[in-house]
């Protein structure tokens, strides 16, 4: 399919958000403390680099998601606001120590690390990521670690190296339905992502595996349901579903604003497949990740668990 045949619309829907997408910004002392702690260490976060709409919410409760292996990506996905580069800097050998110092200062018990895609590195950056994780285990031995990883270009050895580092959650997002993947994700495929998730689930059956999708890109209800089934069939345990919001006019336009009732419906569909679903307009992969982790851990030892407020 050529660019002219892309199913993604050229124009965005009206810029005015529906009422369920309007939120108060909880700025205050805690937000300022988090901001200072992160900036004093010179650490990039996906909260800032990807222009996440939840930054003020998360930072106001002393949580943040660290962006590892630099602040520029070797892929240029149409939905993402992280800078693109063909020649990224080498991994910082002190990055793990910097993240550990920041996490200590914030009092984090559950540390979430995501990464830029590093197709310039032989193992996609897995070794550098493992070094960070090992440092965190040493400096914060009681903290749990969640990693949102790239697809490592399908490198299974790199994946296993990461999984051997004793993480609590392995997260890899399919991002959208299969039909839209070529137009949303640069140099990635839907089936390769499913393969990585399935391999992780088989390699460590007790590991919490997680993935996420955005809605509002022009997907059909039937496609979302199929995606949830695909994720369940490939060993995923946790799925996040959130509204795609266009970071700038350079990015893929929003096709629709999905109602809270539709998110509730998708949650019920996923739960019927045995998935642990966290869905809502502002939900992102790492949004309330600590609470989702605790709820999932409770579910594994009981018949029910409460999710944090989805809005």
UniProtKB/Swiss-Prot annotation:
It catalyses: [[Fe-S] cluster scaffold protein carrying a second [4Fe-4S](2+) cluster] + N(6)-octanoyl-L-lysyl-[protein] + 2 oxidized [2Fe-2S]-[ferredoxin] + 2 S-adenosyl-L-methionine + 4 H(+) = [[Fe-S] cluster scaffold protein] + N(6)-[(R)-dihydrolipoyl]-L-lysyl-[protein] + 4 Fe(3+) + 2 hydrogen sulfide + 2 5'-deoxyadenosine + 2 L-methionine + 2 reduced [2Fe-2S]-[ferredoxin]. The lineage of its organism: Bacteria, Pseudomonadati, Chlamydiota, Chlamydiia, Chlamydiales. It comes from Chlamydia trachomatis serovar D (strain ATCC VR-885 / DSM 19411 / UW-3/Cx). Its main location: cytoplasm. Keywords: 4Fe-4S, Cytoplasm, Iron, Iron-sulfur, Metal-binding, S-adenosyl-L-methionine, Transferase. Pfam families: LIAS_N, Radical_SAM. Disulfide bonds: none annotated. Coiled coil: none annotated. This is Lipoyl synthase. The gene is lipA. One of its GO terms (molecular function) is metal ion binding.
């Amino acid at each position: 399919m050529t660019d002219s045949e892309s199913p993604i619309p050229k124009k965005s829907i009206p810029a005015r958000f529906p009422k369920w997408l309007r939120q108060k910004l909880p700025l205050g002392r805690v937000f300022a403390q988090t901001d200072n702690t992160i900036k004093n260490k010179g650490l990039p976060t996906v909260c800032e680099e990807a222009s996440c709409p939840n930054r003020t919410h998360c930072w106001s409760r002393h949580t943040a998601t660290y962006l590892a292996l630099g602040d520029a990506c070797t892929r240029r996905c149409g939905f993402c606001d992280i800078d693109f580069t063909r020649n990224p800097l080498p991994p910082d050998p002190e990055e793990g120590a910097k993240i550990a110092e920041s996490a200590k200062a914030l009092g984090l018990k559950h540390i979430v690390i995501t990464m830029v895609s590093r197709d310039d590195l032989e193992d996609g950056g897995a070794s550098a990521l493992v070094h960070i994780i090992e440092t965190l285990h040493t400096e914060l031995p009681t903290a749990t670690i969640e990693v949102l990883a790239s697809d490592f270009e399908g490198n299974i050895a790199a994946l296993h190296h990461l999984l051997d580092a004793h993480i609590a959650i392995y997260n890899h997002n399919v991002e959208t339905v299969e039909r839209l993947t070529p137009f949303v994700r640069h140099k990635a495929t839907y089936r390769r992502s499913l393969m990585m998730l399935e391999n992780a689930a088989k390699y460590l059956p007790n590991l919490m595996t997680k993935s996420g999708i955005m809605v509002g890109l022009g997907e059909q209800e039937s496609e979302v349901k199929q995606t949830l089934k695909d994720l369940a069939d490939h060993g995923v345990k946790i799925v996040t579903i959130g509204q795609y919001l266009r970071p700038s006019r350079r990015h893929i336009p929003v096709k629709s604003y999905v109602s809270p009732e539709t998110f509730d419906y998708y949650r019920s569909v996923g739960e019927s497949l045995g998935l642990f679903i966290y869905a809502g307009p502002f939900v992102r992969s790492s949004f309330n990740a600590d609470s989702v982790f605790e709820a999932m851990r409770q579910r594994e030892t009981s018949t029910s668990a409460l999710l944090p407020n989805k809005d």
